[in-house]
Amino acid sequence: MLATACLVGGGTAQAATSQPCDIYAAGGTPCVAAHSTTRALYAAYDGPLYQVRRSSDNTTRDIGVLSAGGVVNAATQDSFCANTTCVITIIYDQSGRNNRLTQAPPGYWKGPAPGGYDNLADAKAAPITIGGQKAYGVRVEPGTGYRNNNTNGVATGDQPEGIYAVVDGTHYNQWCCFDYGNAQTDGQADSPAIMETVYFGADKQWGYGAGAGPWIMADLEWGLFSGVNAGYNNIPSINHRFVTAMVKGEPNHWAIRGGNAQSGGLTTYFDGRRPNGYHPMKKEGAILLGIGGDNSVSGRGTFFEGVLTSGYPTAATEDAVQANIAAAGYATAGGDNPQQGVQIVGGQSGRCVDVPNSSTANGTQAQLWDCGSGTNQRFTYTSSKQLQVYGNKCLDAYGQGTANGTQVIIWDCNGQANQQWNVNTNGTITGVQSGLCLDANAAATANGTKLILWSCNGQANQRWTLRS
């Protein structure tokens, strides 16, 4: 079907007295899950939005709102996570049904964390502002994922539902699958029609649209769909900085809508019957974020807020929700391309841990180099104790070596112990497998000094600072 536009105007009075889940409830399709790291999705909500865990002592802190119905109190996170790294451990459900999202377990595909679990998101990696106040999104890099397989009140079978997510329109890739929504409970891709989610990205393996992407599509299992056809449907590529993405479904009827989360209304990209083989639906009612239903972990994206509803929302209800989102005031924080992760700065040299020549080749030995702005010096300390660079490479003890002089290299993240590190309060970084310290070879300080493992000795060439 042809895309149609519906422009709506947002007013601050409505935004002050009613939030998205109040609007859905007034329309007869209440939220059964409401997730956000940026603001309350009910006017009366004054509980926690999410929880973070810091690496320095593994303690946790709930991050709440400045006031009931308001935006996040990001200063709580900034204070708690100062001079260390933090990950997001829980994204709370504001609906009261306890459909919170936590670290995704393994499915058909395994994640890079121990036990096949997925990584948790770096809590500092997606700074923005909302309503003029600082906030953070959930930045999903390949290997990151959240899930709840034991939910309450989420649509199953062919029951109707609506889903929306506000995402970063500039942070995506062409792989599977940056999803948010309803998924299977066992993590296996054993049937079509067992999930229904919003997908945002440029994956063309199944459905796709006009241009190069990204597109708003639906992940229904055994395929991403941009419309009724299994392949191409005439939906546009999206170029907004912040995107409102919506998918909704009821028996043999579904729709895709979307718009600019900073202004204007929604466009209906598809509204029609289910694809062949997808009627009736067999939804199972789990909820996921950042991954495919079978725990496909190759997608990339950033999530700010989203809900699942009971019942098929009307276009008028969705238009009012979009007006509320646009009035919320999503904006960038000091630039459109915030850097992910931290620099690891040598206490003796003042230089940064660096991947030579921005190489991505397995086996490249890490070195010291003057600190710069490149991604080859930005590391994320993950929930599984990996020091991850480029989103998919990890600092690695070569050959699983545990002897003095073992080279410290980069390698595809695989969850093994030689890629796990303890970031200690005394400034050392020690290998979990070896117990040895990350060491600037021969106590050298020059550019190009190679990094190795060495017995911890208290010297300054084994002391490091994590710097945002």
Q: Which residues make up each language-model segment?
A:
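Short, hydrophobic/proline-enriched secondary-structure or compact coil segments at domain edges
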Residues: A44-D57, Y136-V138, A165, I287-G290, ...
